[in-house]
Swiss-Prot record:
GO annotations of cellular component type: cytoplasm; DUBm complex; nuclear pore; nucleoplasm; SAGA complex
Organism the protein comes from: Drosophila virilis (Fruit fly)
Protein name: SAGA-associated factor 11 homolog
SUBUNIT field: Component of some SAGA transcription coactivator-HAT complexes, at least composed of Ada2b, not/nonstop, Pcaf/Gcn5, Sgf11 and Spt3. Within the SAGA complex, Sgf11, e(y)2, and not/nonstop form an additional subcomplex of SAGA called the DUB module (deubiquitination module). Interacts directly with not/nonstop. Interacts with the AMEX complex component xmas-2. Interacts with Cbp80; important for promoter recruitment of Sgf11 that is not associated with the DUB module.
Residue spans, zinc finger SGF11-type: 94-115
Modified residues (Phosphoserine): S165
Record GO biological process: chromatin organization; mRNA export from nucleus; positive regulation of DNA-templated transcription; protein transport; regulation of transcription by RNA polymerase II
Main location: nucleus
Length: 189
């Protein structure tokens, strides 16, 4: 950049020297034109050299006229868009890595969750199994004596304590239920 600035100032200095003489006005115009032309040609030469060395020169060439027509050809075949790409929906299937089944892509995540036993329902079932195993291992002797006694009829609810309270709350009336409540119970105002 500094080199271009010194070149321009040198051109102006030499141009002013030539203008001082009216006879050299024609020479001054030629000198100015020649200096500007040399700068432009040198700049273009350096830019093209740089593009060729970096491999970007082919991008400036553009597309030939023969190739231009084929590049913008519109496809008018059925089931294809204007670029020639199929518009039919392709079924996206995935293979489950756990069971090697083909599963639709939209159902892959839920399938994998169930297949690997990591879903909500699976974790609940696993929790029940663990609780059952712990309960059965702790009371294995009582269960075995219960089964050995031949007591297969009835339920084991008979010995359980009822969790419901004997005292039942009275149903509240409609007025007491709405006191202080912001619900309108379907009524419109």
């Amino acid at each position: 950049m500094a080199q271009g600035h010194t070149t321009a100032s040198a051109i102006l200095h030499n141009f002013r020297e030539l203008i001082k003489e009216p006879k050299g006005l024609d020479d001054a115009a030629n000198y100015l034109f020649q200096g500007l032309l040399d700068d432009v040609v040198a700049g273009i030469f350096i830019e093209i050299h740089h593009l060729r060395k970096t491999g970007n020169l082919t991008a400036l060439d553009g597309v030939g006229e023969e190739n231009a027509e084929s590049a913008y050809r519109i496809c008018e075949m059925p089931n294809l868009d204007i670029f020639g790409i199929s518009t039919a929906k392709k079924p996206m299937d995935c293979t489950c890595p756990n069971c090697d089944r083909l599963v639709a892509a939209t159902r892959f995540a839920p399938h994998l969750e169930k297949c690997m036993g990591m879903g909500r329902i699976s974790s609940r079932i696993a929790s029940r199994r663990l609780a059952t195993k712990e309960g059965s291992s702790a009371s294995s002797t009582s269960t075995s004596t219960y089964l050995q006694s031949g007591n297969t009829g009835g339920t084991d609810d008979e010995d359980d304590v009822d969790w419901s309270s004997d005292k039942r709350k009275k149903k509240s009336t409609q007025n007491s239920r709405n006191n202080g409540s912001k619900k309108n119970n379907g009524k419109t105002f």
